[in-house]
A protein has these predicted regions:
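Serine-dependent protease modules
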Residues: 1-133
Length: 133
């Protein structure tokens, strides 16, 4: 979203709404956007359980602008230490599910559809996982 305070949000049904950026973290490449629409489905958060190494992880996003893309893999690590561009060490869920530019901010979910994380980084020499077909 850069420094924009208003963004266009495209819903799964194709509707486009103007959204207000209420928070953003450039180091994680994610933002929280408020839209004025009620009755939208909400993805449940897996707050009661921690992801486990080996469990299936499903990544949702729009890599390279390909809306509503789903990829899958497994959880490879649950507390991988990463040093951000700001020098801050944070922990992350590592998965081998293909993540590419455009997946940032999308959900990482378990097979029950519960959100276990947010896609926000890729470790790659090329900058992408490619393999989108």
């Amino acid at each position: 979203v850069g420094s924009d305070q208003q963004v266009t949000v495209r819903l799964a049904d194709g509707d486009q709404l103007t959204g207000q950026v209420v928070g953003a973290d450039t180091n994680s490449d994610i933002a929280v956007v408020k839209i004025d629409r009620t009755g939208l489905p909400v993805a449940p958060l897996a707050l009661d359980t921690q992801p486990e190494v080996g469990q299936t992880a499903v990544a949702l996003g729009s890599p390279y602008g390909l809306a509503q893309t789903v990829t899958a893999g497994v959880v490879s690590a649950t507390e991988r230490a990463l040093v951000g561009s700001d020098g801050v060490v944070r922990t992350a869920i590592q998965t081998d599910a293909p993540i590419n530019p455009g997946n940032s901010g999308g959900a990482l979910a378990d097979l029950d559809g519960q959100v276990i994380g947010i896609n926000d980084a890729i470790f790659s020499e090329s900058g992408g996982n490619e393999g989108v077909g």
